[in-house]
Design a protein with these regions (language model features):
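Active-site histidine-anchored catalytic micro-motif
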Residues: 1-145
Length: 145
């Protein structure tokens, strides 16, 4: 069974933003000969996450507000006591971003059927930047026959 590993690179915007990476995943699958199998999508960062949900602008705004309520940036967090940690000079104050990421997931597995993602009508693969702006990578592993 062939296994193909690829990366998706994303330049994110400040703060929290959500990117629909479904088109890039579809493009990667189309570039292979795999017709039936699965694709693993994995976020390689501790302040990013993935989810499968509807890519609707107002819902995405609701999700951002919901995440900010779960871990407000203005709250006090031990991780943000940079003077008590051995950190690089450019270390951001971002405990809230780590906590938001913990409420989501770092990976999704989606079936491939007849060369296409087996997503539902309103489903998209969403990449969550929780501590932007940054250059991010998403690991994609396509396997099957």
């Amino acid at each position: 069974m062939p296994i193909i590993n690829k990366l998706i690179e994303i330049q994110t915007e400040p703060k929290i933003n959500i990117h629909n990476i479904t088109p890039q995943i579809k493009e990667l699958i189309a570039s292979t000969s795999i017709k039936n199998g699965q694709v693993l999508v994995f976020s390689r960062h501790t302040t990013t996450a993935l989810a499968i949900n509807e890519n609707e602008v107002r819902l995405l705004e609701d999700i951002k507000v919901f995440l900010q309520k779960l871990a407000p940036e203005s709250d006090s967090y031990l991780h943000n006591d940079l003077h008590l940690r051995d950190v690089p000079e450019d270390e951001p104050i971002n405990a809230h971003s780590h906590l938001m990421a913990m409420m989501l997931t770092t990976s999704e597995i989606i079936p491939i059927v007849d060369g296409k993602l087996a997503l539902g009508t309103w489903q998209s693969v969403l990449f969550f930047e929780l501590d932007g702006p940054r250059k991010r990578t998403v690991f994609v592993q396509i396997s099957g026959e």
